[in-house]
Amino acid sequence: MSTGNVYQELIRRYLVVVKKLYEEPIPQTARQRRRRKQQLRTRRAQLRELEGRILKQILDRGPDQLCQGVTNLALAEKSESSN
């Protein structure tokens, strides 16, 4: 699997976990609240792990790729603001 595909898969997993954080209904009973609290702790731990892996992927890329990515982001923001 190429580096780009690994990075995209990590981002996809991250977004799935973030979506799960905010999608569930608000718990009503104490048991549901305890379960929800544990699920939140688990998901936040998953997010921290994925953030670390994403950061590692970014840092493992060469400085040229990183600079090019930052330049592309700046150009995209500039074109969005002009529209």
Curated annotation (Swiss-Prot):
One GO cellular-component annotation of the UniProt record comes to: host cell nucleolus
Q: Where is this motif: Nuclear localization signal and RNA-binding (RRE)?
A: 29-45
**Sequence motif: Nuclear export signal, positions:** 65-76
Annotated GO biological process: mRNA transport
The record's keywords, sorted A to Z, are: Host cytoplasm, Host nucleus, mRNA transport, RNA-binding, Transport
Q: How does it assemble?
A: Homomultimer; when bound to the RRE. Multimeric assembly is essential for activity.
Name it: Protein Rev
Identify the species of origin: Simian immunodeficiency virus (isolate GB1) (SIV-mnd)
Q: Identify the coding gene.
A: rev
